[in-house]
Amino acid sequence: MRIASFFTVLLTLLTLNITPASAERIRDLVNIQGVRGNALIGYGLVVGLDGSGDQTMQTPFTTQSLTNMLSQLGITVPAGTNMQLKNVAAVMVTAELPPFGRTGQNIDIVVSSLGNAKSLRGGTLLMTPLKGVDNQVYALAQGNVLVGGAGASAGGSSVQVNQLAGGRISNGAVIERELPSTFGTSNTIMLQLKNDDFSMAQKVSDAINRSGYGGTASPLDSRTIQVLAPHGNSSQVRFLADVQNIEVNVGIQDAKVVINSRTGSVVMNRDVTLDSCAIAQGNLSVTINQQANVSQPNTPFGGGQTVVTPQTEISVQQTGGVLQRVNSSANLNNVVRALNSLGATPMELMSILQAMQSAGCLRAKLEII
């Protein structure tokens, strides 16, 4: 009885030390080759702005675009007319044509100011053709622009929250032309992993072959899995619906630290670990202060000249860093606690993480975006 209890306790302890492997569906791991969106772009005008449009003297293309649009509507602007408009803005319109997009389907669009308009709030986008890379028109956009920012100005002072020079129009474009599709015409489908990994490519292939489709899937490289599929659109839709819901044991993910060099943000996943190391971080600041000294002659009629001489002061301040020990950390909570103990700013932490990886103390892949 005691032996049975001992083995029960031992089995429980071993179970607690096992890292559970998560399972994900194939639809979350792969993309289907050829099933993707296509970028659309167009140039248009936003009208109805409350005095926050382009300054036409500095953006002549806005006036030219408005003149061309009016001429298409049968309105002739006299030659040499200097239109001082404040409620019109030239904009670029972007959208994505979804895969299998059909004629008459609505898509979202993004409107961005091209000139020096202060705000697009309250404006209306006039009919704008959206073209693809082949210079063909695939959609027409029009509607009221929704701007997420807010701002006000008076007496030379201004307050602004978020940006006002761009906005969105939900369902603001209508598809007028469809892209030809080759879906269903071939007996092979290429599944592309979102992250290249030889082991994951083999796992996805094995999972498909074990799920009643034996011999249909084979990995071609670290990103592509070739799958034999039935011919025809309806048959391939049913086949992919089954394949995409197959679960794959993804196991332990690669440890990764992502650094945004523009914003200074640092993001790391739960598999990041640290080895023991010692770190000293010092700061060097250089301050340059320049003032203009004006020297005038004492006698106004003595023929002297007023001379402006610059006076420059340069100061250098260096603060030494104390050598600090960073203990080995086996989980994310300990990693965060160890890095916070350094008291470094996010920008300093970026340099520290790079140095730790070079020294072999950071057990993770460092990616800078």
Swiss-Prot record:
Assembles around the rod to form the L-ring and probably protects the motor/basal body from shearing forces during rotation. The basal body constitutes a major portion of the flagellar organelle and consists of four rings (L,P,S, and M) mounted on a central rod. GO terms for cellular component: bacterial-type flagellum basal body, distal rod, P ring; outer membrane-bounded periplasmic space. GO terms for molecular function: structural molecule activity. Keywords: Bacterial flagellum, Periplasm, Signal. Belongs to the FlgI family. This is Flagellar P-ring protein.
